[in-house]
Amino acid sequence: MERIRKYLVSEKFAAEAYHGGMEQDKRERALYKFRSGCCNVLVSTDLAARGLDIPEVRHIVHYHLPANEEAFIHRSGRTGRWDETGNIYIIVGPEEHVPEFIGEAAEWNVDGERINPVSPAWVTLYIGRGKKDKLNKVDILGFLCKKGGLTAKDVGRID
């Protein structure tokens, strides 16, 4: 999975990894970047299949075939939520077949076709300080506006 993330980053995609082998703070940062639009690709294990409530996930790509129907449903359930639409893609090699529980799928061959990455709408700035350090959101916004030449509208969420 990390290999896939590194490849996507080398191809100029804003990708983050999310898996159980990561430290909790790194998982939280990856999710924050994905939720806030600072990264538009989240490469994950089944850890993301349950319990994540992220709106507007438009695409799910299954790189490894799910072991069973329940896993497929939970993985795919991250898209098309709240009456929105979503797309599910399954990458299979020449020797693999799509399991019956997935049903009929349209076939699409890439054949070396290059997809240009879409730049994220935002960039994450991590400041490892907070209330304990007597640093609040207003201070951060003021600093970014005064020293960075930004307006309040240029600054997204401050968490």
Role assignments for model-derived ranges:
Residues 58, 86-90, 123-131:
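Short hinge/gating elements
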Residues 1-49, 56:
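Helicase motor core with emphasis on the C-terminal RecA-like subdomain
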Residues 41, 67-107:
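Conserved segment of the helicase C-terminal RecA-like domain
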Residues 50-65, 87-91:
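A short beta-strand element within the Helicase C-terminal
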Residues 1, 22-24, 47-50, 65-69, ...:
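Conserved nucleotide-binding/hydrolysis micro-motifs of P-loop NTPases
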Residues 110-159:
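Non-catalytic terminal extensions of ATP-dependent helicases
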Residues 15, 43, 60, 77, ...:
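Residue-level signature of catalytic and energy-coupling elements of molecular machines
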Residues 4, 30, 72-75, 100-102, ...:
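Hydrophobic side chains in well-ordered alpha-helices
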